[in-house]
Amino acid sequence: MIFFKQIQQHGDNFSYIIADEDTGEAAVVDSSFNAGEIIKVLKAKKLRLTYIINTHGHSDHTAGNAELTSMFPAKIVAHKLSRISFDLAVEDGDLLTVGRIQLKVIYTPGHTVDSICLLVDNEKLLTGDTLFVGECGRTDLAGGSSKSMYHSLFNKLMKLDDDVEVYPGHDYGVKTSSTIGEEKKFNYTLQPRSLKDFIEFMAEP
């Protein structure tokens, strides 16, 4: 049975714990600032942390990596272009297994060059700072690209089934999770636009 927990962090960040309760194996996605809360849950559920997966290299998503690796023999996972310290490099289409749970890596540059999303058993999508509830990630920071964001959103994420659940990296929306279908319908950044129009839209103040 899958154990899935969204943890509210400081600064509107979310961390996630994904575990196979039958095997006790677990992964943390985006350790963020409060590793202590993550450790508390892992110990209470008697879980073995095998992976710490970062959706991208910004410090508000990676700040807890060192504390978690000091407590658990877990591998830090990041996209191969990431500049953070990691043990396992991944790229588009790679599969990670946590017990019997499959995590599919979807490479989604745009917010950063190393941004990834994770599709959990084809049911849940952890989107980091690529897609939020009602918003998408900004592209005006170092390594950002509106052109890449367009292709990540429209040619990758919006091709997933409408009932796939969306779990973002920040609590920026009217609720803490959504679905691909709901985002297609209600997210103003995902309304049909040409690439040129999207780039102009993202440049608006």
Give each language-model segment a name.
Residues 7, 90, 180:
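Hydrophobic residues at beta-strand termini and immediately following loops
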